[in-house]
Amino acid sequence: MASPSRRLQTKPVITCFKSVLLIYTFIFWITGVILLAVGIWGKVSLENYFSLLNEKATNVPFVLIGTGTVIILLGTFGCFATCRASAWMLKLYAMFLTLIFLVELVAAIIGFVFRHEIKNSLKNNYEKALKQYNATGDYRSDAVDKIQSMLHCCGVTNYRDWKDTNYYSEKGFPESCCKLEDCSPQRDADKVNNEGCFIMVMTIIESEMGVVAGISFGVACFQLIGIFLAYCLSRAITNNQYEIV
């Protein structure tokens, strides 16, 4: 059995770790809310662009929403484990944090490796959407119109891309390409936006996905602190229990 003085030295350490871990867990919970919000924001703000990407790319917002939800639940569990000062619950908390960190690390590596695939996918699908524009009532036709109207652009590389489409042969340029509301005759190149949409869309996606990547990286690194604190508090509680015995 440990001396009373030894136990008195251990208790302040446990109290200190509990206080710091509670503060950390609250901040960690907030990061979950932020990731959830970023995922929803990405789904809403990039929806038109994701319509022209492959299925892997469109899953990014859902991954963030799922990760944010898991972090919120895990943060709640971590707060409960810390308040209870349960050694095994804290070890479980540290294990879950480690698992999420590894998943985020793998996801970041996969995203970095396949980043060029997004660019190629966007260009190929955009060209395909132009060729099938208004022919099948495809949802991508609506995405093309929204992008061209919002960014004041026309075609993939430039407005000439439309001249190779069936739609142009029948009706000319779509109204979403027009500089003004009245664009007739719709084969007049002077009345449509000349710049292509591909570079503009890629700039927006890279910029906004950069924000998402930065936030995700910050959250992942922040988890290392939680792993360390949860492990240290668990050890301190376990040692204190042995000292009492």
UniProtKB/Swiss-Prot annotation:
Membrane topology reported for the UniProt record: Multi-pass membrane protein
Keyword Protein biosynthesis attached: no
Transmembrane segments: 20-40, 60-80, 94-114, 209-229
Signal peptide range in chain numbering: none
Sugar-modified residues: N134
GO biological process terms, semicolon-separated: negative regulation of canonical NF-kappaB signal transduction; negative regulation of cytoplasmic pattern recognition receptor signaling pathway
Stretches in topological domain Extracellular: 41-59, 115-208
Database matches in Pfam families: Tetraspanin (PF00335)
Alphabetical list of SUPFAM superfamilies matching this protein: Tetraspanin
Localization in the cell: Membrane
Keywords assigned: Glycoprotein, Membrane, Transmembrane, Transmembrane helix
Gene Ontology cellular-component terms listed: plasma membrane
Positions in the Cytoplasmic compartment: 1-19, 81-93, 230-245
Protein family per UniProt: Belongs to the tetraspanin (TM4SF) family.
Name the UniProt record assigns to this protein: Tetraspanin-6
Organism: Bos taurus (Bovine)
